[in-house]
Amino acid sequence: MAFVSCFHLRLLFLCLALFMAAECRPDELNKKVDSDETISDDDVSARVQPNGGKIMIVRDNDYDASDDNDNDNDDDDNNDNDNDNDDDNDVDRDNDNDDDDFDDSNDDMLSFELDSIEEKDSDGNDVGSTEGHSVESFEDRPFSLSSVDRNSNALGVAAINVNLSTKLEDSNADVDIMLYLFREDGTISFGNETFDVQAGTVKFNIKISNWDFCDGSAQDCSEAKAGEYLDVNIKFKSKDTPIEVTDEERKSQNKPAVCKDKDTPDTDSDPDDSSDNANDGDDDDDDDCPHIYNMGGDSEMLLNRGVMNGDTYTAMPFGFPKVEIEDGEKKIKFRVPKFDDNVNIDPSVTPGRVPKNASPSPALCLKIHILFIALLQAVTLFINSW
């Protein structure tokens, strides 16, 4: 009997060890504690990685609204109470499957990261290889993280905000990424573009400052060309290859419009509206609508047609921004016209809702498979011992 008890104890420890081995991946063991920052509201979470500036976005379709009944008064989780109902920034305590959600094997996760910056001349050709006029890769580039502001807003719409920033040593330029997770539905404007966002939409404003463009001399750039554009490239992950859709196509699928319909009578006192005909098929006062992309899995992405050059809205050249596949990777290419002090690019994305009966992620299936094999081997050993 003692032998059986000892064997059972050893078997228990063996199963526990095997389960922990399956649960803890080497990359997680080597990961620096608190190196990433995760912000959450309702069923949407966004995680940012300071090493490379990667942004990952997921929607928790098993979300329980009761988790939002947080009775503590902490704003930044510095004084977290283990007994509170929820802690929006305490990922490990509130979301047991969070790491699985943010695993690259999760087909429903959306991710975005800066890939490169290339200076171009007026014809779209490289200006040359002189240092300071391109960034070949942002991989492993360190970004500093701001504190999380849960009471922020973007253009009047309540949001949670966290910022990333890095300095480009060769050019002495600065790159800032301002991430906003909207907490409510609303309407925002970006220059000449006005569009709706939802609670759960994530907007990440990319700001480039103090870029020194080539002046056309051989001393400044090897090809003696003047810089007129910056190609800002973002690589991303989505369930499917994005397909551009129109608001009319979306409405046929019973989705709410992203942009205001043309010829909808305005409610302001703008005299330009006085002669507007709601049936004329034209309305000069309507703002532009961003490009709308279906990313698969019910997720959508909005890409603005222009950028903000300081306080001035400037349209990108025809054909930009564009989505392309390069070396097997999905990329967004923004062609930014030359600017003086700073420029802002402002994409946004709304993660889709995965059906409740969706299959478990490959990462979870792998863990279950490993655990099943381990238990099967343990049972075999137990039977053979008798």
Swiss-Prot record:
Top-level taxon of origin: Eukaryota
Signal sequence region: 1-24
One Gene Ontology CC term in the entry: extracellular region
Compositionally biased spans, kind Basic and acidic residues: 133-142, 244-265
Subcellular location: Secreted
Biased composition (Acidic residues): 63-107, 266-288
Positions of disulphide bridges: none
UniProt keyword annotations, A-Z: Secreted, Signal
Expression tissues: Component of the acid-insoluble and acid-soluble organic matrix of the aragonitic skeleton (at protein level).
Main location: secreted
Region described as Disordered: 33-145, 244-291
Name this protein carries in UniProt: Skeletal aspartic acid-rich protein 1
Naturally occurring in which organism (per UniProt): Acropora millepora
Source species taxonomy: Eukaryota, Metazoa, Cnidaria, Anthozoa, Hexacorallia
